[in-house]
C-alpha cells in the first residue's frame, strides 16, 4: 500500500487518482518533456493553464524562477537554452502546483557533470525551502550522494538502505561506493 497525506492511493479510482496526482505530485523526467512550441514561462505554467488556475500564478512563478536561477530566461524558447536550464525549467513546472511530493526519474541522466551538480544542489534547496518530499530514481552514485537516504532495490524489492546522517556529500559518496563494492555493484 502507498499512503500520501492519509490517502491510500493504490485503491483510488482512476479519475480520483488523476486529480490527486495533479494536485499533490510533481514529476521530473530525464528527458525534460518540454514543449518546443512554448517559451520557458509557458512551459512552467502549463499545468496551471490546463487546470484553468492561472490566476495568482505570477508571484509563485517569480519565487520559483528566483530559486532555480531561471528568471532571466522566461521569454526564451526552450530550444535556445542549455540542458541544465531545461532541467531547471522542468523542475519549476513540477513545483508550480505546490506539490507535497516530487517524483524524479533520473533527473540528471541527460546532464554533464557540472549541470548534474547544479541540479542536485537546486533539488536539495527546494526540499529544504519548500518542505517538499523528493523521491528520486537514479543509477548515479554521485547524484545519490546529495540525498538524505538511499534505498537500493534488486528486482523491484528493497534490499539495502543507507542514511546520510549529516555527512558531507563526498563522505556519503564514499559510503555508497563502499556499500556497492561489498555487494558486488558497480
Place the predicted regions along the sequence by residue:
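Conserved ABC ATPase "signature" region
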Residues: 8, 56-73
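Short coil-to-helix segment of the ABC ATPase nucleotide-binding domain corresponding to the Q-loop/switch region
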Residues: 38-45
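Conserved ABC ATPase signature
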Residues: 77-81, 85-87
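Hydrophobic anchor residue at the start of the ABC signature
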Residues: 91, 119
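Conserved catalytic motifs of ABC-family nucleotide-binding domains
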Residues: 98
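Catalytic Walker B motif of ABC-type/P-loop ATPase nucleotide-binding domains
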Residues: 102-105
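Conserved beta-strand-loop-alpha-helix hinge in the C-terminal portion
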Residues: 157-181
Amino acid at each position: 500500500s502507498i499512503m500520501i497525506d492519509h490517502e491510500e492511493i493504490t485503491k483510488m479510482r482512476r479519475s480520483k487518482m488523476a486529480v490527486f496526482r495533479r494536485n499533490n505530485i510533481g514529476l521530473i523526467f530525464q528527458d525534460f518533456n518540454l514543449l518546443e512550441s512554448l517559451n520557458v514561462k509557458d512551459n512552467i505554467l502549463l499545468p496551471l493553464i490546463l487546470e484553468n488556475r492561472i490566476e495568482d500564478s505570477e508571484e509563485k512563478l517569480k519565487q520559483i524562477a528566483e530559486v532555480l536561477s531561471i528568471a532571466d530566461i522566461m521569454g526564451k524558447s526552450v530550444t535556445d537554452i542549455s540542458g541544465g536550464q531545461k532541467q531547471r525549467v522542468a523542475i519549476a513546472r513540477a513545483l508550480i502546483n505546490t506539490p507535497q511530493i516530487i517524483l524524479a526519474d533520473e533527473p540528471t541522466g541527460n546532464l554533464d557533470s557540472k549541470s548534474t551538480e547544479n541540479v542536485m544542489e537546486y533539488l536539495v534547496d527546494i526540499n529544504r525551502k519548500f518542505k517538499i518530499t523528493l523521491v528520486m530514481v537514479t543509477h548515479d552514485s554521485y547524484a545519490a550522494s546529495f540525498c538524505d537516504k538511499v534505498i537500493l532495490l534488486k528486482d523491484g524489492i528493497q534490499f539495502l538502505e543507507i542514511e546520510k546522517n549529516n555527512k558531507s556529500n563526498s563522505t556519503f559518496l564514499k559510503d555508497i561506493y563502499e556499500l556497492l563494492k561489498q555487494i558486488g555493484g558497480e
